[in-house]
Amino acid sequence: MPLKRQIRLKTAIILPFVLTFLFMILAMAAVQTYRYEQTVKELSSKKLSYLTDSISQRLSDFLNRPFFANQMIAYNVGFHHLYQLNDVSRIEDFIRSAANPIGNNIQQFDVVGFGGVNGEYVGLRRDAPEQYSLMLKDARTDDKLVIYQTAVMNDQLRTVIDNYDPRVRPWFSPVAQKPSPQWSSVYTNMDEKQEITLSALSPVFQDKTFIGVMVSDVKLNTFNLFLSELKQRMNADVYVMDQQHRLIAHSGDGSVVSWGTPLSPKGERLLASENHNPIIRSSAAQLDLQGLNVGTFTTYVNQQR
């Protein structure tokens, strides 16, 4: 009996200390885990904020440079009274003289062109560094859109397109309705390449009269290349999508154009949630649930945050 009482007495004295010690250890571990999580969240938030600001700044510069250059060209065409009815030769000469200086300084300049209120069109398309194709429609081409192999009129033709009217194109009609500098929606060019593009648009005025639209293309392939370079510098996946959650450009490999899926018919741009990159796909799926106005959110890919 005395031995049992001694054991019980020891247990009664030691057990509270053991339980208190274990509770303190667990409490300290919980506090440390909480502090670690908070530190990780704070560092992640700061890094994400830095990446977002840096990428936004670079993206703004990428788009602003052709946007403002296009306005400058539009102003000069109107100021120097270069437009003539059914004859865009003077605008052609001006665009040709400006193409190399602007193209060398703004690599994302893919096409620069002018569409007139009477259906004329002239443009230069960059096929390679300092190599351009002239695209022309006026009285000299019998009102057909002729695409040449070089930057000047000659007998070396790439293609001829009948019944081309720039006034009904997605880059002309929005400016005709609201004459102000703006970006076009994403659309497909009507040349022989039929590439998907985004265009900077500016109205052209001559003696305060609206005479046409100056257009500068940023092709989506060029946009993708820019985002791919950003990914290498920033170590972050980047993508741009429209209000319908369809991809405009992304930093990974592959086209944004669908070859045919249950959600995206052939020729349509893919949904961001259909991208083969699991990080982009997971992020896009979260945006589908929370909407485009959400700020910061967390996703998991292969059990990694």
Regions found by a protein language model. Name each.
Residues 1-6:
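Short, Lys/Arg-rich, polar N-terminal cytosolic tail immediately upstream
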Residues 108-109, 193-198, 232-235:
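Short, small/polar residue-rich loop motifs at catalytic or cofactor-binding pockets
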Residues 153-159, 163, 167-168, 179-182, ...:
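Intrinsic low-complexity, intrinsically disordered coil/linker regions enriched in small/polar
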Residues 65-182, 227-230:
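Extracytoplasmic/periplasmic sensory segments of membrane signal-transduction proteins
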Residues 32, 214-216:
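Sensory beta-strand/linker motifs that couple input domains to effectors
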Residues 7-15, 21-110, 181, 197:
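Juxtamembrane extracytoplasmic/periplasmic/luminal helical "stalk" adjacent to the first N-terminal
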